[in-house]
Amino acid sequence: MAFRWVAEAKRRGAKLIHVDPRFTRTSAMADLYVPLRSGTDIAFLGGLIRYMIENEKYFKDYVVNYTNAATIIRDDFQDTEDLEGVFSGLKEAPQGTNQKYVYDNATWQYKRTAPFDAAKAREEAIKAATFAEMIQKMVPPPAEKDPTLQHPQTVFQIMRRHFSRYTPEMVEQICGTPKELFLRVAEMLAENSGPERTTMFVYAMGWTQHTYGVQNIGAAALLQLLLGNVGRPGGGILALRGHATIQGSTDVPTLHHSIHGYMAHPDARRRHDTLRDYILTETRPTGYWANLPKFMVSYLKSMYGDAAKPENDFGYDWHPKIAGDYSFMASFHAMAKGEIKGAFFFGQNPATSINGGLIRRALANLDWMVVKDNFEIETAAFWYKSPEVESGELKPEQIKTEVFLFPSAQVGEIEGTFTNTQRWIQFHEKAADPPGDCRSDAWFTHQLALRLKKLYADSTLPRDQGFKNLTWDFDYEPGKYPTNTRIQGEPDVMKIWREINGFKTDTGELLKGFGELKDDGSTTCASWIYCGAYPEEGKFLPANRNPDPDDKPGTHLGWAYAWPANRRILYNRASADPNGNPWSERKKLIWWDAGQKKWVGYDVPDFPATKAPDTPAKPGAAGMDAHDGKSPFILLPDGKGWLFVPTGLQDGPLPTHYEPMESPVPNLLYPKWQTNPIAKIYEHERNQLAQVGDPQFPIVLTTYRLTEHHLSGAMSRWLPWLAELQPELFVEISPELAQEKGIQNLDWVRITSKRGSIVAKALVTPRLRPLTVNGKTVHQIGMPWHWGFMGLSTGDVVNDLTSWVADPNVMIHEAKALLVNVEKAK
């Protein structure tokens, strides 16, 4: 659906470049198709960064004024070029982290104009009377800068040295991309960026599913900042999510490490003992995140209602604290060791997920498991129909896991909202009742909570007080329950939205925006970024359906609601020059109106509406007063886009090329450090890794999705039409590799990794081509991962080949580059 807008852009003259290991339908539409070896994106993007710097193709006025290029970094910082592949601060990891190394980022920090003792400031701040006074005491002196960009420790010069060896020749050697194609990409990017033009990067799982996935995206962000393509129409980085409302599931989170609105989850391992400790640890004292106390207190009021009071830290001690790594792989690692007794799986099919064979064996260690889905998926059926049961390794009568399968309503059978990748919250209506016992996730969660509240009602145990005080008032008011349905017991969606949006605690009046939030308990709001979506009774903005007419700019402010504050382009102050004038008339979005003394335009300003461009920063101030009128990036402490990331990333302040955990070749840039030094590896006898250039596993496998299927196939392989469109699992093999292996089209072939072995039909195609990597021929194959052993269309589980290795920032797995062997099946 999204690609129709790409097609429309091409019709209007836009250029489309497609960089991918495989030639796909997107490639066929592209002006330029560029192959590369899977897992080498940072080398490719790093080469583009070097090209823009050395050829002075970067947008200098934007870079100097709107990024931290001019900021000076501490003298003791050392780059990968100084330390042969790692940054300063590398040290051995503590036990239990599933890592060999971690970083101490002290040397990555800005050099300040005066000394600042953060520990001493914290000692004083904790004594302050109010949260605002606490934050004020944590404000550091400003950073040293050199607007000429000549100081050797400026971010610009550090970045220049860091990428100096990412030459077109090095890109060709690492990526296998012909030098001429790479240079054409660089030229096209430069031609389509600057004051008059913008370029957008669009990515999906091809960038994320790596042990350096966050740094892949960081490299693209760095490049876009250099080119002036952030905060402007037609620019930015667009993530194509895996399915509907993935954005919403991180905003109102199903994440283990954050709570609503991207606030950090209270954590027993950090200085989060009290609410004050949490606020001092997590609040950035300058920039908009200085408002964290307002967001957090309002969130706690949404959790505990009248029981949340100033004298009990608004119930902070009742809030659960995480005490370890509860990410996907870590949880199944614990399950494999018998440390988890029960599990819920809503719309999730882990039996076909990463290192699927190990996951299915881990499921057999549970006492009980709840699966809520549309059909009896592989996870629900693992105990009697998995490959391990079929082979006799596991026996159903010996598996103790009791499985509870609850049939789920489908999306057309419920009403609610989706949040898309552009942060638009859109309401959708219900088309029909679900059949039989099928129920929505909201019904299940609501009914479970009501029953648990009854069970805990008489408890006097201190540990249960938080759950007893948890507010749960989502039943319809008497006489208000819908009469056009046979389903009973659904919660009132608009009551849930009241809590998400927020209201004044004493009167119940809905809040019009997050600017009204307070840190004294007078406002209740579950999710500060969604505050304003439901500003008054009868006015639910996600249900708006008023598009711009054709002669308008197309920001569509009357269609749905985009968080925050209905802004359609984040950091849109950057769409105007430092003086507040549009960089370009054809690209103008917001601008400063001196007559009205405010920012005006086609979008809601992502900036203080009345802060003039010539407003100076207030020395020593906290919050937004610390930023001048020329600092668009309001959520960052210095208001500048970060080319160099001093804090927040676990694996370095600049993107650096490392090889995937399994690679056919050594790391040409840094031979001493083959892989990301702080990637997570979950050790298990069934999670072995192939060594560099292992002759038993010489071929690179990348996995992908098909238009006709959805993720593990749980929503598509049961549907006859979709199953007929893509009826069986296949493996794409180049003609050259097929000839070498004696494989014909449609032959059954066996694909084997260090973790597992599967069979599939061969699809011999020139869509994948051999690449020359540092003088060596490297073959790549591709496989879709939608299949499993249940449903109308069945096939082997491709993820049985993958491993439990993860990016250290977000713990995503590496399924886009691994080593396998391919042979004709006997």
Across the structure, where does each feature detected by a protein language model lie?
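Conserved short loop/turn motifs at secondary-structure junctions
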Residues: 170-177, 203-211, 240-244, 347-352
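Glycine/threonine-rich phosphate-binding loop and adjacent beta-strand/alpha-helix elements that clamp
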Residues: 401-434, 449, 785
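Long, well-ordered, tryptophan-enriched scaffold segments
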Residues: 13, 22-195, 284, 445, ...
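Long, contiguous, secondary-structure-rich segments that constitute the structural scaffold
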Residues: 443-499, 595, 600-608, 612-627, ...
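A glycine-rich phosphate-binding loop feature that marks nucleotide/adenosyl-phosphate handling sites
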Residues: 65-69, 188-189, 204-206, 236-247, ...
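Extended redox/cofactor-interaction regions of prokaryotic respiratory oxidoreductases
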Residues: 1-6, 12-14, 18, 133-143, ...
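Flexible glycine/proline-enriched surface loops and loop-helix/loop-strand junctions
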Residues: 29-30, 151-152, 164-169, 202-207, ...
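Short beta-alpha connecting loops at secondary-structure transitions
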Residues: 28-36, 380-382, 390-391, 407, ...
